[in-house]
Amino acid sequence: MTELATQPAQDLAEPPIPLVFTDNAAAKVADLIAEEGNPELKLRVFVQGGGCSGFQYGFTFDDAVNEDDTLFEKNGVTLLVDSMSFQYLVGAEIDYKEDINGSQFVIKNPNATTTCGCGSSFSA
């Protein structure tokens, strides 16, 4: 009698994307960097305590890369996320929106259990 070796089926699903940095966001960052006149600038996205829901997002330009930063590149622009913030941003999408209410960077975060009406504060 012949025995057939069976192996568990491999999970063919793609691993989750750690962070999505949209074309719109990258284009706006490129414009802002050009206005500053410093091509070494990178957009740093971070999470800190505060806001009406417990955590809030922050954006700043930085020309330094820290040892614990994760870098994301899109269309020649670099996005930096520190290790503490990264755990709250895994799977999030960073976009730039312009509408009749104004323009702003927007984070769609699947880890947020509640969000504030302003969109810059969340709880996880």
From Swiss-Prot:
PROSITE patterns: HESB. One of its GO terms (biological process) is iron-sulfur cluster assembly. Binds 1 iron-sulfur cluster per subunit. Its cofactor is iron-sulfur cluster. Belongs to the HesB/IscA family. PANTHER family: IRON-SULFUR CLUSTER ASSEMBLY 2 HOMOLOG, MITOCHONDRIAL. Required for insertion of 4Fe-4S clusters. The gene is erpA. Pfam families: Fe-S_biosyn. GO terms for molecular function: 2 iron, 2 sulfur cluster binding; 4 iron, 4 sulfur cluster binding; iron ion binding. Keywords: Iron, Iron-sulfur, Metal-binding. Homodimer. Iron-sulfur cluster binds at C52, C116, C118. This is Putative iron-sulfur cluster insertion protein ErpA. HAMAP family: Fe_S_insert_ErpA. It comes from Polynucleobacter asymbioticus (strain DSM 18221 / CIP 109841 / QLW-P1DMWA-1) (Polynucleobacter necessarius subsp. asymbioticus). The keyword Iron applies. InterPro entries: FeS_biogenesis (IPR000361), FeS_cluster_insertion (IPR016092), FeS_cluster_insertion_CS (IPR017870), FeS_cluster_insertion_RrpA (IPR023063), HesB-like_dom_sf (IPR035903).
